[in-house]
Regions:
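Arg/Lys-rich, alpha-helical DNA-contact motif
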Residues: 1
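A short, hydrophobic, proline-anchored segment that marks a local hinge/packing element in signaling
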Residues: 99-108
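Short beta-strand segments
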Residues: 36, 103, 117
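Juxtadomain coupling helices with adjacent low-complexity linkers
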Residues: 83-90, 94-96, 111-144
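Conserved GNAT-family N-acetyltransferase fold
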Residues: 47, 102, 114
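Amphipathic alpha-helical effector-binding/dimerization core
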Residues: 4-81
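Active-site donor-binding loop signature of nucleotide-sugar glycosyltransferases
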Residues: 48, 106, 118
């Protein structure tokens, strides 16, 4: 039988903790938060948290896939070997959607990112990037 994605890193047991932490971020930013892992040449949404108070927000399912070369989540995974701290994209996966994601570093064999996506087309990078980078760092710490 196929093991759940990320099982070799204990991702399932930490997913609940991540979801609780990211619910607060999703609420404060009014944006959807996600934990994404690489599966071959695709980005796979492992966990998604949506804000509860917004009239409109980006919604997508756990298990959704897209090419690693598109979207902030996939592009952030591509930053694992570089010095850049995060990736920002606009309209690459859905017209009007803008994302910001940071790679999860320091876990051997894991290619993953943590990020947010919003519909309003603007992200205050100075405010949001440090939160997302910190969240990605926490995921890495918990999985080491």
């Amino acid at each position: 039988p196929r093991r759940p994605m990320g099982a070799e890193h204990g991702a399932d047991k930490h997913r609940v903790t991540w979801l609780e932490q990211q619910q607060a971020e999703a609420e404060s930013l009014g944006s959807t938060a996600h934990l994404t892992v690489a599966d071959g040449d695709e980005a796979l949404a492992l966990a998604v948290v949506e804000p509860t108070w917004t009239d409109f927000h980006v919604s997508y399912r756990v298990g959704a896939r897209h090419p690693l070369t598109q979207g902030a989540a996939g592009k952030a995974i591509g930053l694992l070997e570089g010095d850049d701290a995060y990736a920002v994209t606009s309209g690459e996966l859905q017209t009007g959607a803008r994302g910001l994601a940071a790679p999860v570093r320091g876990v051997d064999g894991l290619r993953a990112s943590v990020g947010i996506v919003t519909l309003d087309g603007s992200i205050d990078e100075d405010a949001v990037a440090p939160q997302v980078i910190a969240a990605a760092g926490e995921v890495g710490e918990r999985l080491r």
